[in-house]
Amino acid sequence: MRGSFFSRLPPQLSLLLLLLLLLSWRRVWTQEHIGTDPSKSPVAPVCPEACSCSPGGKANCSALALPAVPAGLSWQVRSLLLDRNRVSTLPPGAFADAGALLYLVLRENRLRSVHARAFWGLGVLQRLDLSSNQLETLSPGTFTPLRALSFLSLAGNRLALLEPSILGPLPLLRVLSLQDNSLSALEAGLLNSLPALDVLRLHGNPWACSCALRPLCTWLRKHPRPTSETETLLCVSPKLQTLNLLTDFPDNAFKQCTQSLAARDLAVVYALGPASFLASLAICLALGSVLTACGARRRRRRTTVRHLIRRQPDPEGPASLEDVGSPTTTAIQA
């Protein structure tokens, strides 16, 4: 019966029906061996102990008083919530087992130390929240592996210095939150390494009205902000003890500031410095040798002249042989 039915159909349609039958049999076999438990479903991620996971790759580990990043993370995890815990340190490769993470929240922990290789392996991470922690410093290259990052929050920490090498080139970063830290200025190359940056949150920092603010003021003029935000961006003048709006400084206000050397210029200085020192030392040694030789030559001339003067006879002649004390006198006396 089945053979007669398939024989009446076109060959293409017969192959399509056979393919559908094979797919249906595979689905029945999967349900029999795996079951309907969502924890065993390939859609649900492998869940760390004490955390709750849901289909779609979300792992919720919030407010569990965890002292460290939980073990048991997998590549199925797309979103990891670790906020409101007691994680104080991020070691190297802390999230290496969750390389498919897109969203990572570490807000309101007790973070004081983040290793420079803590985020290695998170090349597709898009959002990272490190706000409301106790970070005072960050190592160079900490965020360099996060090439796909578009949102980064460092708000509510104790950062006093943020060098360009810490962030590294983040070509897709659009939002950077730095509010409520201890920043007084931003390094010149920091904003240049973030070409896609559109939102920069800065309020709540003790900005100092100095030449170091020139890169930041230039960026703010090129990226107008809402009035409510710009009104809170104030800097303190150390000499006058007054508050000024960051947006009130035109570019000519920094004309008295000396332009700092670029990295390329510094490299040239560092390269030529030892060479120029060695060249100066060689010149000094050469001049010293020449002067020493000239002095020795003058001394030899003076010595020769003195010997010649002593050997010349007296033009008046000796008064007697006794005065001269010649060998002849000595022989006669003998």
From Swiss-Prot:
Residues 287-334 are cytoplasmic. InterPro entries: Cys-rich_flank_reg_C, KCNMA1_auxiliary, Leu-rich_rpt, Leu-rich_rpt_typical-subtyp, LRR_dom_sf. Residues 38-75 form the LRRNT domain. The keyword Lipoprotein does not apply. LRR repeats lie at residues 76-97, 100-121, 124-145, 148-169, 172-194. PROSITE patterns: LRR. Residues 205-259 form the LRRCT domain. One of its GO terms (molecular function) is voltage-gated potassium channel activity. Disulfide bonds join C47-C53, C51-C61, C209-C235, C211-C257. Interacts with KCNMA1. PANTHER family: GH08155P (PTHR46473), LEUCINE-RICH REPEAT-CONTAINING PROTEIN 26 (PTHR46473:SF2). The transmembrane domain is necessary for interaction with KCNMA1. This is Leucine-rich repeat-containing protein 26. The lineage of its organism: Eukaryota, Metazoa, Chordata, Craniata, Vertebrata.
